[in-house]
Amino acid sequence: MAAATISCRRCHADTEVICVHCETGTVSGEALTQFTVSGIWALDGELARQLGPWPTFRKSAAAEHEEGVFANHCSHCGALQDDMHLHSEPGAPFFDIPRAAAGVVRLTPLVGTVRLSGDEHFVVE
């Protein structure tokens, strides 16, 4: 897991956000390295158990996702912290984790193999 501290888009308090960062994995049968997963709509029990330390990362219904996706929420006001602002642009905390400045992203290893469904992100060089 990758974690970073951001300013909440609603209340502006510092809040921790996380994402699944994989050193290695398989996406649609293709081996990938150093990628993140966002827009997670399903996860296995093992990953759900390991997400226990981050209760603000939970399923959230959104208009464009009828069944909801797992997303970060502010620990102070509960506002959703949209994945787009965390993954999609240079300068976002999870845009390029391998090249992030020291101390910006904190990594916590997951135990074993986990399975999830979402959108993978990686930097093309």
Protein language model regions, located:
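Short, non-ligating residues that shape and space the ligands of small metal-coordination modules
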Residues: 17-18, 80-84
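Short cysteine-rich clusters marking metal-coordination/redox-active sites
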Residues: 8-11, 74-77
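Short, charged low-complexity linear segments at domain edges
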Residues: 39-60
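Long non-transmembrane domains of secretory-pathway and surface proteins
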Residues: 11-17, 21
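Short cysteine/histidine-rich metal-coordination sites, predominantly Zn2+-binding motifs
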Residues: 23-34, 87-100
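Long C-terminal interaction/binding lobes of large macromolecular proteins
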Residues: 99-125
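Residues immediately within or flanking Cys/His clusters that coordinate Zn2+
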Residues: 5, 71
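Short linker/helix segments within small regulatory modules
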Residues: 23-24, 59-69, 89-90
